[in-house]
Amino acid sequence: MVCIRRATVDDLLAMQACNLMCLPENYQMKYYLYHILSWPQLLYVAEDYNGRIVGYVLAKMEEESNECHGHITSLAVLRTHRKLGLATKLMTAAQAAMEQVYEAEYVSLHVRRSNRAAFNLYTETLGYKINDVEAKYYADGEDAYDMRKNLKGKQNHHHAHGHHHHHGGGCCSGDAKVVETAQAVDGKAVSK
């Protein structure tokens, strides 16, 4: 059995190892730390019954934008654990957090033109649409599809529930809650 849960600072090395095994796009540890300290609600891992991380999603909110939107930085599932719906569950968890915590209007991501499996997951299962093609986006010169999926965002959010409730923080409202959370996560890491 594999469970999907929010990532912690303690998961970052395993997430990086999973990334290195699965993808040609790799990141330094400080980039993972930047994500978890800035947007702790948006990182999820798939953990097997032995406590091993077998997949993850690394996501963030785009700050330099007039529209509040999330971005999927990286998604990976180990080859041994594919075809179990884990990528869909990881993506769904991150998208829901973007919507609930940050009131994101849409989610964006990039995918290699040649990556048919990922492209099919995004379009057929998760409802993403091609927004643009970015020529030579990847280091090896391959083009990327810039894809987007609309979320309810601010405009429909409260009406959909039929009642009003307050959400803490967000890229489009005050960031106080997010900073508090990041400091708490940071404090946890320092005090170990």
Swiss-Prot record:
GO terms for cellular component: cytosol; NatA complex; plastid. It is an enzyme of class 2 (transferase). Induction: Down-regulated upon abscisic acid treatment. Residues 2-152 form the N-acetyltransferase domain. Its EC number is 2.3.1.255. It catalyses: N-terminal glycyl-[protein] + acetyl-CoA = N-terminal N(alpha)-acetylglycyl-[protein] + CoA + H(+); N-terminal L-alanyl-[protein] + acetyl-CoA = N-terminal N(alpha)-acetyl-L-alanyl-[protein] + CoA + H(+); N-terminal L-seryl-[protein] + acetyl-CoA = N-terminal N(alpha)-acetyl-L-seryl-[protein] + CoA + H(+); N-terminal L-valyl-[protein] + acetyl-CoA = N-terminal N(alpha)-acetyl-L-valyl-[protein] + CoA + H(+). InterPro entries: Acyl_CoA_acyltransferase, Ard1-like, GNAT_dom. Coiled coil: none annotated. Keywords: Acyltransferase, Transferase. Signal peptide: none annotated. Expressed in leaves, roots, shoots and flowers. Disruption phenotype: Embryo lethal when homozygous. GO terms for biological process: embryo development ending in seed dormancy; response to water deprivation. Pfam families: Acetyltransf_1. The keyword Nucleus does not apply. GO terms for molecular function: mRNA binding; N-acetyltransferase activity; protein N-terminal-serine acetyltransferase activity; protein-N-terminal-alanine acetyltransferase activity. PANTHER family: N-TERMINAL ACETYLTRANSFERASE, N-TERMINAL AMINO-ACID N(ALPHA)-ACETYLTRANSFERASE NATA. Catalytic subunit of the NatA N-alpha-acetyltransferase complex. Required for male gametocyte development, embryogenesis, suspensor development and the formation of the quiescent center (QC) in the root meristem. Involved in plant immunity through the regulation of SNC1 and RPM1 stability. Belongs to the acetyltransferase family. ARD1 subfamily. Part of the NatA complex. Interacts with NAA15. This is N-terminal acetyltransferase A complex catalytic subunit NAA10. The gene is NAA10.
